[in-house]
A protein has these predicted regions:
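Positively charged n-region of N-terminal signal peptides that target proteins for export
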Residues: 1-6
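Bacterial N-terminal signal peptides
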Residues: 7-17
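Eukaryotic scaffold repeat domains enriched in small/polar residues
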Residues: 22-342
Length: 342
């Protein structure tokens, strides 16, 4: 991690975050190599679409929420919440029969696991669950199977993040120009405090607030995906800044050293959904302090020069462990990949 932080200091000295945003940072070095098939599932269990990955407080255990061997857990009893150790061995699983569309995950300082259910069907979904490390349900936010825009309902909740004081933040809304486009704040006991956001592209407006993360200063980073930017707020919802140099953010992760990891799983040169010309998909690594971009893990399925897509999205969710290994959760290829230093 020392060399990566050093590289970010060099980048910061050469350009400010605003200057970096002028041209797509597609040519940063890739100091990582990909480890395929590192995570081991039980015999007969197949990976489903996977957008959610996080690391526990110890920085070693990898928590994942996958979609039951498909792109939905509806009608399935497979436990979608999985815990892996550093050898890639599955050591715990739970949540079977509870979810429709596991989407976002967060592990708090006490080791509790928070998971969003981003769709609704058959009386399930549109909720946020808090589990103990052993899978006991400790809290439920939202109404099962009910999509809404009130203080006690969600409509396609994307992600959840827990502030240092225990306050709960949920980003709500997965469809551009439709449904919700907001960030909601709750007390640690689940009492609604406030919300902010609406559809749009101005400060504090969102089009798919897809990912949440806190930096060491307690600032909330929101991956405003369909607006091709990250927005930064204080915990009262006051706008601080926006960054576009990390491209079209599907996943955002910030480690204890304020190294930021951002996935772009959608950018394409082709007009239409995902239009973000000139930007390659992949994982950009930089500094949450100044917005500099130091490294880039390119998506092997990234659009070609003529805008054609040779495949679907790769890394959508992202996390990094205490050793600096990076984990990419993939929706289209239905897998979880590990990236280690070369």
């Amino acid at each position: 991690m020392r060399s990566l932080r050093g590289a970010m200091m060099v980048v910061a000295a050469l350009a400010t975050a605003s200057a970096l945003a002028e041209a797509p940072p597609n040519s940063q070095p890739n100091p990582f190599r990909t480890v395929e098939n590192w995570f081991k599932l039980p015999a007969g269990r197949m990976w489903g679409s996977t957008s959610a990955v996080d690391i526990d407080r110890g920085g070693t255990s990898i928590w994942v929420a996958e979609r039951c061997g498909a792109n939905s857990c509806a009608g399935k009893m497979d436990p979608p919440i999985l815990k892996f150790d550093q050898s890639g061995t599955l050591v715990k699983s739970f949540g079977g029969g509870m979810f429709v569309f596991p989407h976002g995950i967060a592990v708090d300082k006490d080791g509790n696991v928070w998971v969003t259910d981003g769709q609704g069907r058959e009386g399930k979904g549109h909720q946020v669950f808090k589990f103990s490390p052993d899978g006991e349900v400790l809290m439920t936010l939202g109404k099962a199977g009910v999509a809404g825009d009130g203080p006690d309902t969600f409509n396609q909740p994307d992600d959840v993040a827990i502030a240092p004081n225990g306050d709960i933040f949920v980003s709500d809304g997965h469809t551009p120009a439709m449904g919700n486009a907001r960030v909601m704040k709750f007390t640690k006991d689940g009492k609604f405090i406030k919300q902010w956001g609406r559809h749009g592209s101005g400060p504090g407006e969102f089009e798919v607030p897809h990912a949440l993360a806190f930096d060491s200063r307690g600032r909330l980073f929101v991956g405003d995906r369909a607006n091709n930017r990250i927005q930064i707020f204080d915990q009262e919802g006051n706008f601080i800044d926006q960054w576009k140099q990390f491209s079209r953010p599907s996943g955002v992760y910030i480690d204890n050293h304020d190294v930021i990891y951002v996935t772009d799983s959608e950018s394409t040169d082709k007009p239409g959904y995902g239009y973000n010309p000139g930007w390659r998909r992949g994982i950009r690594v930089g500094s949450a302090k100044d917005g500099s971009v130091a490294a880039f893990i390119p998506d092997p399925l990234s659009p070609t020069a003529d805008g054609k897509l040779p495949g679907t999205s790769a890394a959508e969710g992202v996390a990094a462990d205490a050793a600096g290994n990076v984990y990419g959760a993939e929706v289209g290829p239905k897998t979880l990949k590990k990236y280690v230093r070369k």
